[in-house]
Each structure stands twice: as C-alpha cells, then as structure tokens.
Amino acid sequence: MRRAETIEKLYLDFDGFFASVMQQAMPELRGRPVGIIPFETSAAYSTSVIACSKEAKAAGCSNVMRVPEALDLCPELVLVTQRPDLFRRAHNALLNEITCEIPIETVKSIDEMTCSLDTSAIADPAHLAQNIKQRIKNNIGEYITCSIGFAANRFLAKMACKMDKPNGVTIWQPEKMPGPLFALPLSDIPGVGKKIERRLNAANIWSIADLWDTQPKHLRSLWGNVNGERMWYALHGYDIYATPTGRGMFGHGRVLPPNWRDRLHAQSCSRLLLTKAARRMRREGYFAGMLSLWIKMRQGRWSDSLELPSVQDDHACLKALTALWDKAAKHLPLKAEILRVGVTLHRLSAAHARQLDLLENDDEERQRCEVLSTAIDALNRKFGKRVVTLGPWTPPPGGYAGGKIAYNRIPSAEDFW
C-alpha cells in the first residue's frame, strides 16, 4: 500500500447534470428553476421531482421530492419530463471533450468520473481544470458546468470536488492535509451514512479529527467489515482500490402513471421491462438462475422469486414471469393500486461457465428459443430499432421503459428501442 506524496487523481462531477442538460437543449428553461419528472402526465401532482436545477436547489428543492412539496417551496418551478436518450448522448459528448484534455480512468456514473494525472497536470492542476471547463463551454454549451477536485487519491478527490459547487475547482495538496478535512462534518465522508455515524458517535467519535486519530482496526470493527479500515487509509492519502466485483443482476423498475396502476397494465409493463433486461443480459453474455418480481402498492408491497434453469432467452424468462404474476394474483388485494413494478434477473453465470441441466435447459425447445432470441436481437440491431418482439409490446405512457434516467448506469442506444 503506497501513500501518495503529491496529487495524483482528478474527480469531476457535473453540476445538476440532468437539469442543466435540459437547460442547454431548451433555451426557454435557462435561468429558471427546473424540476425533472419521470413521465409526462396530466396528474403531475401524483409524481415526484427526480432531479432539479441549481436555481430550484437554491429555492430549497432537492432531488427525489414530491411535486406538491417542491411547488410549495418554489411556485415558479417548471416541470419537465425526463429525456434519457438526450442525457445519454450528452454524457458521451462530454466524455469525448474531456478525453481531448486528459484520459478518463473510470466512469463512476452518468455525471461523475475520475482521471489519473500526468506530470504536467500535477504541476498545474488549475490550468487543466480551466481547459476542461473551457472546452465544454465552447463545444457543448455554457449551461453545462462541472466541479473538479484534485487530491492524492480518488477518495479524497471526490470529497474535494464537493467543496466548491457549482462550477468550482478544489486542490488538496498532500502537504496541506488533513487541515481541509477537519472543517467538514462526518457525514461528508463518502460511505458515512446515518447508521455508521451513530456507531461512530457511540464510540465517542464526533468529528473527522476524532476519526483521523482512531486506529484503522478499530474502525474495521465499528463498520463490521474491511470498509472502515480501507476508509481510514483512504483519508490518510493511501492509494486504495476496492476489489472489482462481478455483475450481480440485470433488472428494471418503473413508476406507473395513474391510468396504468391496475394489475393488467402493471403485468404488461413488467413484461416489457423483463424483455429489455433479458436483452441486456444476452448482450453481456450471461445466463440467469433466478427471476424476481416486486410490486409496490398503495396498500403495501409484494415480492417473490422463481428459480430458473440457467436461461437467457425471452421465452423462458416471460414464462417464469407469468408464473410469478399468477402467484401474485392470490395475494394482491382485488383492486390493488400498483404504484411501481420491477423485475430482476440474478444468480448469473457467464456463458463460458454455464452449468447445463440436461433435463431442463439443453433440450431442443430450449435451444430453439435461444436461437430465436439471438435472431430477434440481431434483427433489431440491424435496423437500429424495435422491429421484432416476442408477443405484444405496449410501452406505458411517458416512454423510456428500461431506458430511464440513471445515475449509476449509462443506458445504451438499444435501451430506447
């Protein structure tokens, strides 16, 4: 484990990414408080603001806030329906511009990324930050801004990035540490939520200064895992990287518009979501051993899972989904108002590691279904749109099912077919 002696990492976070992209694309929104809602509906009061502009944040609004609450805080709030494909294209265009100044090391989410610094960037990080900002302004637009942090490692650079938002630059040279940290509350440390903060307080750790002086093994015991110890080393400027994890699941969820909250419409939506999840799974070369269905109602929640014989074709996935809905029908209230539905394919195995069950998933029917799904995928890719589907395909109002606004997953163009 190595402790950096100079700044080595850049962390970039776009300011109010979704709303600022909309303001750049729609001049009539510029300078106005904007709230992004998940779908176009005449009953906007029944939904939530899922992202908002800096003008809306200045008025007290926040991401994931009920529309009535947001309008109480900011009566001038302009509600705009999300445009995930626009966000995807903006993300790709912005990455291209940043890459012209410095190679991108890791894309953390649709609006955050990290870079390793070369000798010229280490010598003059402020100049690099200014070049990135100017390139974005000149080639993309002035309404999309970013905040940039420089530090010894990625963890500290992320914290520095949050210090001067929006459109700021913060440089934490190792020789100046830990001074800048001590002015921050514990909750500003990535990974310290309310539960962990309560544990720290119970151990008489009330500030980052207290945390700094705590032994790393003690933090490991307070966290209950190695993350507490890793966090201590990251705060102290060590080059810490988490062990890469494999793909765990493919899934989609959808908030249903008011006129789609009956069981038949919810089932139709889940069918579409599952087809898209299965298509993503095939694209990445995985098979699933379990399907889960979850339903959020005004009257409560219901969820269940069904084992699968290591499959990836639409026919097998949709057959299992029908079985889960048949089970759900026995438990849901007769007139259940379903607010949200979701599906998850998990217990994944890569194609090269797939264990076949000779009785269930290696017969002629299964092979035909897999060939059929692969052929459908190829046709849709060839024509660049959805030309063939297995059964009915009726997206819910608002569109973008399976291609929704995303922080931790950047949709591909195929997710919008």
Task: Label every PLM stretch briefly.
Residues 2-4, 11, 188, 201-335:
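DNA-contacting surface of Y-family translesion DNA polymerases
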Residues 13, 60, 70, 111, ...:
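A residue-level signal for conserved active-site and pocket-lining positions in enzyme catalytic cores
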Residues 108-112, 151-154, 286-290, 336-340:
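Short Gly/Ser/Thr- and Asp/Glu-enriched loop/turn motifs at secondary-structure junctions
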Residues 114-133, 164, 204:
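Catalytic palm subdomain of template-directed nucleic-acid polymerases
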Residues 310-417:
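Acidic, metal-coordinating catalytic segment for phosphate/diphosphate chemistry
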